[in-house]
């Protein structure tokens, strides 16, 4: 880019393609952790801590040793407050979790590879084959449902297309990067077609100097 020019990058993400912290069952939560190469013990432990935070009981989880919190997550970043959470794992999970869709499952038409791998019974080969076919349909402009390309599962659901995350990234002159994220819900009301559910801004950072 030329001196003095500001470059922008925008991304629109369907929220229901993410794992929902307040609704998803323990096997989905653990599956997402395993998608990042963590073992069964670590995946199960984090899933149980998430359930304990929201006051859910799973017979596969050990007794927490404290009163269940019974609180909902209001932002994905609250995962950092759970004891024993690995910061590197937390950073990896953030793009694949949400608190806004309120759905039990995920929409395969919008889900990331990692979210699809969290579904019980989904192997890497199955997911990669599905993603290739999904991309092919999109490239051909086909609007047909993608549900016929995966085995039936109670963890897959249709998206009403009401909640979206908008990512905006600006690279300013001098190499400073500013990122903001807004979560919006479409209302269907002409006077107020959308409303903001969340707004997050990351501290500015500088790009490394070219070598």
What are these regions (language model features)?
Residues 1-211:
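Compositionally biased linear targeting/interaction segments
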């Amino acid at each position: 880019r030329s001196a003095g020019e500001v470059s922008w990058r925008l991304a629109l993400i369907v929220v229901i393609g993410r794992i929902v912290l307040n609704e998803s069952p323990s096997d989905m939560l653990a599956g997402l952790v395993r998608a990042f190469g963590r073992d069964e013990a670590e995946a199960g432990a984090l899933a149980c801590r998430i359930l304990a935070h929201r006051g859910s009981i799973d017979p596969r989880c050990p007794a927490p040793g404290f009163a269940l919190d019974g609180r909902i997550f209001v932002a994905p970043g609250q995962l950092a407050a759970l004891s024993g959470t690995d910061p590197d794992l937390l950073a990896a999970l953030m793009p694949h979790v949400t608190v806004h869709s309120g759905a039990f499952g995920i929409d395969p038409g919008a889900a990331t590879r990692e979210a699809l791998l969290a579904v019980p019974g989904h192997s890497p080969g199955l997911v990669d084959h599905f993603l290739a076919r999904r991309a092919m349909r999109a490239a051909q402009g086909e609007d047909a449902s993608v549900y016929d390309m995966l085995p039936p599962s109670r963890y897959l659901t249709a998206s009403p297309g009401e909640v979206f995350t908008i990512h905006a990234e600006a690279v300013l002159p001098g190499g400073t990067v500013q990122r903001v994220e807004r979560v919006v819900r479409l209302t269907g009301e002409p006077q107020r077609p959308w409303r903001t559910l969340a707004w997050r801004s990351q501290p500015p950072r500088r790009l490394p100097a070219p070598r």
